[in-house]
From Swiss-Prot:
PANTHER family: 1-DEOXY-D-XYLULOSE 5-PHOSPHATE REDUCTOISOMERASE, 1-DEOXY-D-XYLULOSE 5-PHOSPHATE REDUCTOISOMERASE, CHLOROPLASTIC. GO terms for biological process: isopentenyl diphosphate biosynthetic process, methylerythritol 4-phosphate pathway involved in terpenoid biosynthetic process. It comes from Wolbachia pipientis subsp. Culex pipiens (strain wPip). 1-deoxy-D-xylulose 5-phosphate binds at residues 123, 149-150, 173, 196, 209, 214-215, 218. This is 1-deoxy-D-xylulose 5-phosphate reductoisomerase. The keyword Zinc does not apply.
Length: 391
């Protein structure tokens, strides 16, 4: 049996992972689960999977979790130290589905634990950890398998042949506002931004998809994960979301990975790697009336060019951290209807342009410091703009 941990088990990816593990209880021993605040679901999952540990990050819900797990053998951990403890448990495979920069330190703890395979759904840890994180993983022979469908697709192709690659193509659905004008985007509401046409996702990533900042972060992630220069990474809008990624080789051949739009598929791949699992998803191309591709609208969705500017800047690592931090702040403010939809990317741009606390990034504390300063600056920029509420 594979020993596994799932950090962030109550989010959208975490729940999908738990569902898969429940179907295959004879294959996996769940050592630990973690959640930020959803103690009720965490307790339920821990019971169903016979987990040894359950960690709740928000200390306010420690007693609730303890009460829900009374009479079980599940050990409860709490707060940042508790999350660090369960992340440090050596397992065969750790699924990391924590949202945002909060996932970075747990990823590093998992790498240091002796765990050899990380199924990673937290792109922000790669965006902010960059070469520092990947160097640590390489030194300890840790295999990182991306769960994002696009990177998972590229990973699968490059596993077979990573020589003579011309470029990689990441596909983007275009989000719910494909072909909208700038004027139309100006009045987008929170509910509209959360209604994705093809994927079922959490709130933060749904907004990121709507602004196409998700693809911007994925470009930075791909640059690090696959050690490929920014000018050899391309994003193409593909509304049907059937083709997830393409590797173009120098001899003119291109290898694409096709699959239905359900995150269970890349999660199952990561759980089973290096083997392949059996799922009921069978793509029927005869039922696909069309597969369309188009250039992104850089005028309406400038986040893609922003990611390229960051990677080609004189301080790409620092600017990547700034971009991520400012985006997390801006998305949070948009979700509270405190800034408008178009202002999300404007806040990110302005934060990068005005950030001046540059230094070498040599440790986790350096990353945390830049992240902290970026958040302060992003909040100041939002305050200077005033409230722009969209009902």
């Amino acid at each position: 049996m594979k020993k596994v941990s799932v950090l962030g088990s109550t989010g959208s990816i975490g729940k999908k992972t738990v569902d898969l593990l429940l179907k295959r209880k004879e294959e996996y021993q769940v050592e630990a689960l973690s959640a930020n605040s959803n103690f009720a679901l965490l307790a339920q999952q821990a019971n169903l999977l016979n987990a040894k540990y359950a960690a709740i990050s928000d200390e306010r819900f420690y007693k609730d979790l303890k009460e829900d797990l009374l009479g079980t053998n599940v050990k409860v951990e709490v707060g940042a130290p508790g999350l660090a403890n369960v992340a440090s448990l050596p397992v065969d495979l750790s699924v990391i589905a924590i949202v945002g920069i909060a996932g970075l330190e747990p990823v590093i703890k998992v790498i240091e634990s002796g765990t050899k395979v990380i199924a990673l759904a937290n792109k922000e840890s790669i965006v902010c950890g960059g070469k520092l994180l990947l160097k640590k993983a390489k030194e300890r022979s840790v295999q990182i398998i991306p769960i994002d469908s696009e990177h998972n697709a590229i990973f699968q192709v490059l596993q077979n042949d990573d020589k003579c690659v011309e470029k990689i193509i990441l596909t983007a659905s275009g989000g719910p506002f494909l072909n909208y004008s700038l004027e139309q985007l100006r009045n987008i509401t929170v509910n509209q931004a959360l209604s994705h046409p093809t994927w079922k996702m959490g709130k933060k990533i749904s907004v990121d998809s709507a602004t196409m900042m998700n693809k911007a972060l994925e470009i930075i992630e791909a640059h690090h994960l696959f050690k490929i220069s920014p000018n050899r990474i391309e994003a193409v809008v593909h509304p049907e979301s059937i083709v997830h990624g393409v590797v173009v080789y120098q001899d003119g051949f291109s290898f694409a990975v096709l699959a239905e739009t359900d995150m269970e598929i890349p999660i199952a791949y990561a759980l089973s790697w290096p083997e392949r699992s059996t799922l009921n998803y069978k793509l029927d191309l005869t039922k696909q009336k069309k597969l369309t591709f188009q250039e992104p609208d850089h005028k309406c969705f400038s986040s893609l060019k922003l990611s390229m500017e960051v990677l080609n800047s004189s301080s790409p690592h620092t600017n990547s951290i700034v971009l991520n931090a400012a985006n997390e702040i801006a998305v949070n403010e948009f979700l509270k209807s405190r800034i408008g939809f178009l202002e999300v990317v404007e806040v990110v741009k302005s934060t990068i342009e005005n950030f001046d606390k540059y230094s070498d990034i040599n440790s986790l504390s350096d990353i945390i410091s830049v992240d902290f300063e970026s958040r302060i600056l992003a909040n100041e920029i939002i305050k200077s703009k005033g409230i722009c509420s969209v009902e």
